[in-house]
Amino acid sequence: MDKYEFNIKVEQIKKMVNKEDFATAMKIADTIDWRRVRNANLLSTISQVYEKNEQYQEAKEVLLLAFERAPIGKRFLYKLTELALKEGSIREAEDYYQEFCELAPEDTRQYILRYLILKEKRASQDQLIQALERYINAELDEKWMYELAELYAKAGRNDA
């Protein structure tokens, strides 16, 4: 495929993504060898296309390519952790989580990743609460505050 044809396909994919037609975007994406693409942001977009179509393995493979192109991308590690969890690969998610923590030890999102991993492992309510409390103590985020309140209710605690 020459550069002109590639650029046309990429533009088509972007149009489909903007229309939220991820199925068509994926059909176009399937015709491209993403290993030859160097643009990490484009690879990230393609990963999202596969994720929206619940093709988590493909999403992960493309996102790994993006991470190779931009190894300082903690955003990619965060997303790789999420994708591994969606795929049910807890061990792999923990590996990405560890890399994320090493790369960005001050990033409070590590507590969210920890919570998501614990949740996937079916950890105790107290462990889940502790992970979310650490995040909420650092960041005030309504979504996660609500989740924490639900955990308190399930655990029969009135801390909320």
Where are these regions (language model features)?
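Single-residue signature of alpha-solenoid repeat helices
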Residues: 25, 59, 93, 127-128, ...
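Canonical tetratricopeptide repeat
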Residues: 45, 79, 113-114, 147
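Residue at a conserved register position within TPR or TPR-like alpha-solenoid repeats
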Residues: 16, 50, 84, 118-119, ...
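Conserved structural position within tetratricopeptide repeats
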Residues: 31-34, 64-68, 99-102, 133-137
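Alpha-helical segment of the N-proximal tetratricopeptide repeat
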Residues: 5-35, 45, 51-52
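Start-of-helix register in tetratricopeptide repeats
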Residues: 7, 41, 75, 109-110, ...
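Residue-level detector of the short coil/turn that links helix A to helix B
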Residues: 20, 54, 88, 122-123, ...
